[in-house]
Structures are given as structure tokens and as C-alpha cells.
Amino acid sequence: MRNFLILLATVGLSTSACAQSTPATEGPEVPSDPPYIVLSANQDEPNGYGFCMDTYGAGQSDLMQTHSCKPSKDDEPRDYAGNDTRFEYSEATQQVMSYPFEGYCMQALIASEVTVFALLECSDHPRQKFVYSAEDKSLRLAEDQSRCVTVASETVPAGPWVKRPLNLETCDDIAPSLKQWTIATE
């Protein structure tokens, strides 16, 4: 019994040490090739991969979220469904564009008290326009730059991965670790 308790205590200490060595504010180690847009702080993504913008479910979807960044596979075509965590930002058009699903862009759908993000055909719609600031790493709605693209504070299981909902919040009300994005280009 004593040996079991010592083993249990040792495992507990090892787990604590591991958890402390990867703080929530440490940057992720994204396992895929650019382009991608990833939350700058890893938060609690268990692999250390970070939370990338993603389509909801497997492959192409109308809705968006953040999800564990997924590893790239060798020689996969651009339109490979597993690339659904790969997005790019165009400063010229101010759009967040899907990498595998060409011609589709992120759009904020705003209703009373609720905002969701959708992946819709790219257009000149004002809610497809976002301003990225490299200085504070925020991604702001162009038509109301007091509002930032953020992630929820709670992580939800997603099969072998994890996810967090995307939100549109008043920038000043949100902790930096929930609204700072890193945009990796090709």
C-alpha cells in the first residue's frame, strides 16, 4: 500500500510539473504548414498545438469555431478536408479566407445578443471585413473596431481534440489571451 501511495504521489508530482511547464500564455507549436490563424496563447490545448480558426465539424461547414490545430499530411491537396483549420488573412481585402475551400470567407452573423461566425462565399459584405493589428494582435470587425474576434474561456472536448467557440466581444472587456491572434502566411 505504501509503495502504491508513493507511486501515486510521484505521478501526481510529474503531472503537476508538466502542467506548470506549459503555461496558458506560452505560444503554441502549430503542427501544420501555413497559412493558419492561431490564438497566440496556447491556453489549455493538451498537445501544445494551439487553437486555430476552423470550420465546425469535419471538412467544409457553414459555421466556424476554434479547434486544436491539426497536423499537416505530406502531399495533401489544397482542398483536402483535413485542412479545415487553415485560414489566411488578406490585408488588401480585409477578409479571413478559407485555405482549402477557396472563395469562402469568415462572416460575422450578428443578431440581438448573439453572434456566430459563418463560412460563406466571399463578398463585399461589411461583416466579412476585419482589421488585423500586428501591434496588439487583435482582429477587429472593420465596421465597428471596438469589437474583436475572441474565443470562449472554456475548452470543450471534440473527439481526440478540443475546441472553443468564436465570439465577437467588446475588445476592452476581454483578456488579451482570449483575443490575440497570430497570422502565419505561406
Kindly give the residue locations of the regions a language model identified:
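Sec-dependent N-terminal signal peptides
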Residues: 4-13
